[in-house]
From Swiss-Prot:
Gene3D superfamilies: 2.20.28.60, Citrate Synthase, domain 1, Cytochrome P450-Terp, domain 2. GO terms for molecular function: citrate (Si)-synthase activity. The lineage of its organism: Bacteria, Pseudomonadati, Pseudomonadota, Gammaproteobacteria, Legionellales. This is Citrate synthase. It comes from Coxiella burnetii (strain RSA 493 / Nine Mile phase I). Belongs to the citrate synthase family.
Length: 430
């Protein structure tokens, strides 16, 4: 219980609410009993509302800090791999050697999907968006795994989480292969998580190929950097769906649906499209001028962030990774990448961008990196969903194990008509 109180006065009454202090971040006022006093709180978009208590991820947007279970994101990207980060997000601690080996082995045992699942793809139109295919097949997995759908059992919840993390790259790669008319590639247990994904994306049955280690490491970092980001729109969607008692496959499918929205998961694709629109280095000045004009609808994508008012901590890691990939594939001198590097330099030196703290964000570099690897832009959000699956399922597991777990039921400020009588059709005015 909290000894500190916040007092709210309204309608000739004064009500006290407990104030809770987090281990990091701003204090939280618990107003859940406000409705008992004849009023509700209005916070459109939840920008000042903590909808849950969580121990998973912390963000300080003012200072440019992102922590997974207390570990800085740049250290995890440098010293760990995605499988370690998955273990960390799910269980709260980084694994030791034995724990990691067991976890990786378990993931690899669940990477394959039923043959009936692969037949789902034949029902999609030839030009279906990969996100539509992934969303549908993830939701359909609940039809195949009845053995672990008792969400009241921790062991069932854990097994479902493992299956989702393991099968997501397989289904993501299948969505890409189907979209380009190539045969599916089966996962190979000898490869690590990122290598396996690249193998299933770009491999063919006609030749044995090994993914470039630089590209595999880059993909692993992309997975790490996008693994979780606190209570964003898609994570909140997963939690709300989970609060109803829906199975985890349905909940993750709901999260994918939310992520598909261009305001959430499409930023790196939008950034790449912007670069193509600018077209040439000689046009940068014109578009910089447009970006500074409040009356111009043009927005410079990939710069600044809704949460981070400082440098996005993921961007520094992604910048380094981007340059490593460009070196590995020899694409530094292609017009698109030369344009991006020039734009980055101008933005980092221009007083307007410095004053507004419009630094290049993770989306600016991740879109370039994925493009350099050879991944088309319609797969960018799929890869985002693949990366974020562990974050979603970790939040779902945390919520399901919480004694405060309850059905989400927001209120509203109703501004519609007051009660009125129904008039028969023949008496209604034209």
């Amino acid at each position: 219980m909290s000894n500190r109180k916040a007092k709210l006065s309204f309608e000739n009454q004064s009500v006290e609410f407990p104030i809770y202090s987090p281990t990091l971040g701003k204090d939280v006022i618990d107003v859940k009993t406000l409705g008992n006093h004849g009023a509700y709180a209005l916070d459109v978009g939840f920008y000042s509302t903590a909808a849950c208590e969580s121990k998973i991820t912390f963000i300080d947007g003012e200072k440019g800090i992102l922590l997974y279970r207390g570990y800085p994101i740049d250290q995890l990207a440098d010293k760990s791999d995605y499988m370690e980060v998955c273990y960390l997000l799910m269980y709260g601690e980084l694994p030791n050697k034995g724990e990691k080996e067991k976890f990786v082995r378990t993931i690899k045992e669940h990477t394959s999907v039923y043959e009936q699942v692969t037949k789902f793809f034949n029902g999609f139109h030839y030009d279906a968006h990969p996100m539509a295919m992934v969303l549908s097949t993830i939701g359909a997995l609940s039809a195949f795994y009845h053995d672990a759908l008792d969400i009241t059992k921790p062991a069932d919840r854990e097994l479902s989480a493992i299956r989702l993390i393991a099968k997501m790259p397989t289904l993501a790669a299948m969505s890409y292969k189907y979209s380009i008319g190539q045969p599916f590639m089966h996962p190979r247990r000898a490869m690590n998580y990122a290598e396996n994904f690249l193998h299933m994306l770009f491999g063919t049955p006609y030749e044995e190929t090994e993914p470039d280690p630089v590209l595999a490491r880059a993909m692993d970092r992309i997975f790490i950097l996008h693994a979780d980001h606190e209570q964003n729109a898609s994570t909140t969607t997963v939690r709300v769906a989970g609060s109803t008692g829906a199975n985890p496959f349905a909940c993750i499918s709901a999260g994918i649906s939310a992520l598909w929205g261009p305001a959430h998961g499409g930023a790196n694709e939008a950034c790449l499209n912007m670069l193509r629109k600018i077209g040439d280095e000689k046009n940068i000045g014109q578009y910089i001028k447009k970006a500074k004009d409040k009356n111009d609808p043009f927005r410079l994508m990939g710069f600044g962030h809704r949460v981070y008012k400082n440098y996005d901590p993921r961007a520094k890691v992604m910048q380094k990774t981007c340059y490593e990939v460009l070196d590995a594939v020899g694409r530094h001198n292609e017009p698109l990448f030369k344009l991006a590097i020039k734009l980055e330099k101008i933005a980092l030196e221009d007083d307007y961008f410095i004053e507004k703290k419009l630094y290049p964000n993770v989306d600016f570099y991740s879109g370039l990196t994925l493009n350099a690897i050879g991944i088309p832009s319609n797969m960018f959000t799929v890869i985002f969903a693949l990366s974020r699956t562990v974050g979603w399922i970790s939040h779902w597991m945390e919520m399901m194990s919480s004694p405060d777990h309850r059905l989400a039921r927001p209120r509203q400020l109703y501004t519609g008509e007051t009660e009125r009588e129904v008039i028969s059709l023949d008496k209604r005015q034209a």
